[in-house]
């Protein structure tokens, strides 16, 4: 007799919707308690930060090898936290694959410490800050007739700050609307229509989103934005609005990467790292860039004068994570061999779909903030022109948690 496999849905929106596991046993049936000790929280999330960075580069390399003509933009924090939450309900090899694929070695870091790290990471990112808007959220949509394991529900709520909603997946259109409305609201309207089609046999959907809006510490002036050429490749050139500012920047040239490295701070704790390779050196940059180099860029401060040109852009990318995560060894959870018995005992589960959508907007202000004028003293010698007028990399990094929030490559700024 054929085994009946019920579907779980995983959606990520710089954002992710997924199916979770039960690690309640490892955590002794109780979620890690919240703490007001900021230094303790930082220490917990710092333990998983190197793993998140390595995971980010693993995903980036997979996407880059798939296509060198497309924009790339994703949130490693969103994807990793969603699948770590899924691991709370996974058993056996399914459980092992997920944590190993995320870059964790349980002989080096106990599983309870991994989940505590994510708990404190999400808690820290969600701290109110009037200077920037950085929010993350997890929503668990459960079919009205489904009975989920209590310890799983407890752990996803306490560890991953997940909200739980009862929903009728048989009414696929209404269920789709509720999930999309939840994501759109949580992402401040930046991520819409994440779910295009919803299988009525779905038992649960786990949605994770992360949304960021930041103000540049030193905004660009709109009057200096002009239309200029952006060279997509040797045959293709497009016109883009190019922001411009003459001043002092955290900017240096990296011989190893044959690239300019620019760090622009947002008001608050987020830094944008832009990496512009020399002509014909994009492959060299992608092959050699790693967590260790990124850490060095973020640690050392440079002060260089430059005439900077940076394109205004608004891009979004959507990924089916089944193939992406297969490249890092996470496969069983999508197959009929999946063991997600920590989520429900009633029937076998597998993740039928894992979607991730991320959106990026770069403009003069960074957000709706009122622009300001900055006056800076620069050397009398003519500063170099550094113009991001060809494909470049972009990494948004949270200094509090030492985590890469978003990673991307801009190949064509006009591709929405």
Swiss-Prot record:
Q: Which SUPFAM superfamilies match?
A: Serpins (SSF56574)
Give the tissue specificity.
Plasma.
Entry's Gene Ontology molecular function annotations: identical protein binding; protease binding; serine-type endopeptidase inhibitor activity
Which CDD domains does the UniProt entry name for this protein?
serpinA1_A1AT
Glycosylation (residues): 68, 105, 143, 269
UniProt keyword terms in alphabetical order: Glycoprotein, Phosphoprotein, Protease inhibitor, Secreted, Serine protease inhibitor, Signal
Q: What is known of its domains?
A: The reactive center loop (RCL) extends out from the body of the protein and directs binding to the target protease. The protease cleaves the serpin at the reactive site within the RCL, establishing a covalent linkage between the carboxyl group of the serpin reactive site and the serine hydroxyl of the protease. The resulting inactive serpin-protease complex is highly stable.
Summarize subunit and interaction data from the UniProt record for this chain. Interacts with CELA2A. Interacts with ERGIC3 and LMAN1/ERGIC53. Interacts with PRSS1/Trypsin.
Function, in words = Inhibitor of serine proteases. Its primary target is elastase, but it also has a moderate affinity for plasmin and thrombin. Inhibits trypsin, chymotrypsin and plasminogen activator.
Name under which the protein is recorded: Alpha-1-antiproteinase
* Organism (species): Bos taurus
């Amino acid at each position: 007799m054929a085994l009946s496999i019920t579907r779980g849905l995983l959606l990520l929106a710089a954002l992710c919707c997924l199916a979770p596991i039960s690690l309640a046993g490892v955590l002794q049936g109780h979620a890690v308690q919240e703490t007001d000790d900021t230094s303790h929280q930082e220490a917990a999330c710092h333990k998983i930060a190197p793993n998140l960075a390595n995971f980010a580069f693993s995903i980036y390399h997979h996407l880059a090898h798939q296509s060198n003509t497309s924009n790339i933009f994703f949130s490693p924090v969103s994807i990793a936290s969603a699948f770590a939450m899924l691991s709370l309900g996974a058993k056996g090899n399914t459980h092992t694959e997920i944590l190993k694929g995320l870059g964790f070695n349980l002989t080096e870091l106990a599983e309870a410490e991994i989940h505590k790290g994510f708990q404190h990471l999400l808690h820290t990112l969600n701290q109110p800050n009037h200077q920037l808007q950085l929010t993350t959220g997890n929503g668990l949509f459960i079919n009205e007739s489904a009975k989920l394991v209590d310890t799983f529900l407890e752990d996803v709520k306490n560890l991953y700050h997940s909200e739980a909603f009862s929903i009728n997946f048989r009414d696929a259109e209404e269920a789709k609307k509720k999930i999309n409305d939840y994501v759109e609201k949580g992402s401040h309207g930046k991520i819409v229509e994440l779910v295009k089609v919803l299988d009525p046999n779905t038992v649960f959907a786990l949605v994770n989103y992360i949304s960021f809006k930041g103000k540049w510490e030193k905004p660009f002036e709109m009057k200096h934005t002009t239309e200029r050429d952006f060279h997509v490749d040797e045959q293709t050139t497009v016109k883009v609005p190019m922001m411009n500012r003459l001043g002092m920047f955290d900017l240096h040239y990296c011989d190893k990467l044959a690239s300019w490295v620019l760090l622009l701070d947002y008001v608050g704790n987020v830094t944008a790292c832009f990496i512009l390779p020399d002509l014909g050196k994009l492959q060299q940059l992608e092959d050699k860039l790693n967590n260790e180099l990124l850490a060095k860029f973020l640690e050392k401060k440079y002060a260089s004068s430059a005439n900077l040109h940076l394109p205004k852009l608004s891009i979004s990318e959507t990924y089916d994570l089944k193939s992406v995560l297969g490249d890092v060894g996470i496969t069983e959870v999508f197959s009929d061999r999946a063991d997600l018995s920590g989520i429900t005992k009633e029937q076998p589960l597998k993740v039928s779909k894992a979607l991730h959508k991320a959106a990026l907007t770069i403009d003069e202000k960074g957000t709706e903030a009122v622009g300001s004028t900055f006056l800076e003293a620069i050397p009398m010698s003519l500063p170099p022109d550094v113009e991001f007028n060809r494909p470049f990399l972009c990494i948004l990094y949270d200094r509090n948690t030492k985590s890469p929030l978003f990673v991307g490559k801009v190949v064509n700024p006009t591709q929405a």
